Amino acid sequence: MHIETIGSGPDVVLLHGWAMHGGVFAPLVDELSGDFRLHLVDLPGHGHSVDAALPLAVAPVVEDLVERLPRALWLGWSLGGLFALQAALARTQSVRGVALVCSSPRFVRDAAGAGAWRYGMSPEIFEDFAAGLRDDWRGTLERFIALEAFGSDHAKEELRTLRDGLFARGEPAAGVLATGLRLLHDVDLRPALPAMPVPSLWLAGRRDRVVDPRAMREAAAMAPRARFEQVEHAGHAPFLTHAGIVADALRRFEASLSP
C-alpha cells in the first residue's frame, strides 16, 4: 500500500472513500500540514496502490497499516471510516482516537425490527450501483460522485473537484470497485460501538445524501467518549468545501486526546 507522509507534528492517518485516493484530501492537507504529520493512504486497488497485492478487506489492511505507521489519530472518510473504526476497535494501542467524516458503522438500511437501522442507504441503490459497475463502470462512478456533491451549497465546485481528482492517480481497479461496494453493503460494526476503547469524533455534512447525518448521530450515541458535530451547508465531502471548519474540528478533537 502506498502511504504519503506530509507535514510535522502529531500523527494523523487519513483514509479515503470508495473509488478515490489519498489525493482527495488536498484541501485538508493544506489546512493541517503545518500542525500535524499526515499519513495519506491509497487503499489497495486505488491510486498508487492499484497493483497492491493486499486485498481490499478491513482486517488485513488495518494490520498492514498499524505495522507501518506510528500511533496516531485515525481519520476515515466514507468507506475509509470502516477501516479507521476497525483499527480503533482491534488495535487500540496504535490508535489515539478515531474521526469519522461522513461515515457510518453500517451503510445500508436494515429492515424494521429491533435491530433496524433507519437512516442507512437503500439496498436497492447499492444494487443499482453494483449493476452499473458491470455495465458501465465509468458512468457509475460519475453518478456516484454527483451524489456525493448533491446537497452542498458548493455542489458544482465539489463535483468539479471530485471529477478532476477521480483519475488523478490513474484508474482504480475495476474488481476492487465491486469489492468496495460489497464492504459498504455487508460490514456492520454497530455491535462493537458500546465497547469503543478510544474517543471518537463523528463529523457529518448536514446535506449529505450518501451518509445521513442522523445515522452518524445515532452511532455516536452508541459509543462512549464520542462527540457528534455537523458542518452546515456541506454534502458528503465537507473537507473539500469547508476545509477550515473540518480542520478546526480535528484540532479540537486531537487536543482532547491522550498522547
Residue spans for each PLM region:
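Conserved HGGG/HGGXW glycine-rich cap/lid loop of the alpha/beta-hydrolase fold
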Residues: 2-54, 58
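Conserved acidic catalytic loop of the alpha/beta-hydrolase fold
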Residues: 59-73
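Gly/Ala-rich beta-loop-alpha elbow adjacent to hydrolase catalytic centers
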Residues: 76-80, 84
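Flexible "cap/lid" loop of the alpha/beta hydrolase fold
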Residues: 89, 94-135
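Conserved alpha/beta-hydrolase catalytic His-Asp/Glu region
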Residues: 134-187, 191-192
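Short beta-strand/loop motif that positions the catalytic acidic residue
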Residues: 196, 202-204, 208
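Conserved alpha/beta-hydrolase "acid-adjacent" motif
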Residues: 209-215
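Catalytic histidine-centered segment of alpha/beta-hydrolase-like enzymes
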Residues: 231-247
